[in-house]
């Protein structure tokens, strides 16, 4: 059976390759410090587990969902007003998805025709590229560079490219580069969208993992954002429910409606007990979320301080659960460095090249180990001479 030519657009799966090498080293008895994948090591909160468990006792909850529960959509509306200060979100402006990765991957099928153009950041989370490729669309990259604090710099985007683009993906706090949006940047993005009749698709997965300042927010809290954009909003990292796949598309009603129409053709909706768990997340207390943010900040400090102490350039890490580090010692091949780091130090990270053309020469490190384990990982890097 010949696979679709569409699959030829996708490269090798980096995580699978790294995992195979990791398993081989484990089998040899090597100590492994795995910071490659952004899966929280914190447990889900008790009230969330209880909500899911209780719902699962009801046989009616095991039927096809087909729709979002009205109380779930209302919980999202209320959360946006309470948490982000965004008023005016109505249930018709909310649609669930099985994780925002699935949502971003499918959005292009709802909005793009073959040959349409979208703008994506470089470096970026890989599904931003994949969603365009699946929809037979054309990718145009806009760079995230240290000179501009790894933030979108819309003045540097070719106006003719912007005029052709149907939408622009923005992701802040950013995976993989760890940058956090500012009011000035968001205002520039909104003005840019208006100037070029462009939809903004904002990925907001890490609003509760922001360091050294004000709490993270939402793109939709800025004046004019609801007129030009939508936001993918995830519960995965804030509430440690990555496997439950709980995400939402929120914003412009016509875009949400198109996305909902597509999902209705390929999916029977979110499992009802998971919807109940999502409601518990949205309506529940936030003290544990804040405590967890501080723990991530401790990990960020341990890793960045440790690497800088070895002579690495201090990584960019202002938000998200990732640290974006330049390769030390003048190295340039991120995959080769990751393999060397794994074999010599037992430290597993992700090569920057897997996040787009500008990612080469960097690695992404996930803050999924406690500070004492991070200290041991840094020591293993030192002993291996990788600095």
Regions found by a protein language model. Name each.
Residues 28, 135, 195-196, 310, ...:
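Helix C-cap/helix->beta junction micro-motif
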């Amino acid at each position: 059976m010949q696979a679709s030519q569409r699959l030829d657009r996708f490269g090798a799966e980096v995580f699978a390759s790294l995992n195979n090498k990791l398993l081989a080293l484990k089998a040899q008895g090597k100590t492994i410090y795995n910071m490659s994948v952004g899966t929280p090591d914190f447990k889900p909160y008790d009230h969330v587990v209880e909500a899911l468990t209780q719902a699962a006792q009801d046989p009616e909850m095991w039927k096809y969902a087909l729709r979002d529960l009205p109380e779930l959509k209302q919980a999202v509306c209320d959360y946006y007003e309470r948490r982000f200060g965004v008023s005016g979100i109505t249930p018709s402006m909310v649609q669930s998805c099985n994780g925002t990765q699935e949502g971003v991957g499918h959005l292009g099928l709802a909005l793009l025709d073959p040959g349409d153009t979208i703008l994506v950041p470089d470096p970026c989370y890989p599904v931003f590229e994949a969603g365009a490729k699946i929809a037979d669309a054309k990718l145009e990259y806009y760079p995230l560079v240290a000179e501009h604090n790894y933030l979108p710099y819309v003045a540097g985007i070719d106006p003719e490219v912007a005029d052709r683009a149907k939408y622009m993906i923005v992701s802040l706090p950013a995976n993989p580069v760890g940058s956090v949006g500012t009011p000035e940047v968001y205002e520039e993005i909104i003005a840019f969208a208006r100037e070029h009749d462009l939809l903004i698709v904002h990925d907001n997965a890490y609003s509760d993992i922001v360091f050294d300042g004000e709490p993270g927010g939402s793109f939709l809290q800025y004046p004019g954002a609801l007129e030009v954009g939508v936001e993918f909003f995830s519960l995965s990292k804030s509430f440690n429910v990555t496997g439950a796949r709980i995400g939402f598309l929120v914003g412009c009603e016509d875009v949400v409606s198109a996305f909902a129409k597509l999902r209705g053709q390929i999916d029977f909706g979110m499992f009802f007990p998971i919807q109940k768990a999502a409601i518990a997340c949205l309506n529940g207390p936030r003290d544990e979320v804040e405590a967890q943010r501080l723990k991530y900040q401790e990990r960020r400090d341990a890793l960045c301080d440790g690497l800088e102490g070895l002579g690495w350039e201090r990584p960019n890490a202002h938000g998200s659960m990732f640290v974006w580090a330049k390769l030390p010692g003048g190295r340039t091949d991120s995959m080769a460095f990751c393999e060397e780091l794994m074999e010599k130090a037992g430290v597993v990270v992700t090569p920057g090249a897997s996040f787009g053309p500008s990612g080469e020469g960097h690695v992404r490190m996930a803050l999924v180990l406690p500070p004492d384990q991070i200290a041991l990982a840094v020591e293993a890097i030192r002993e291996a001479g990788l600095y």
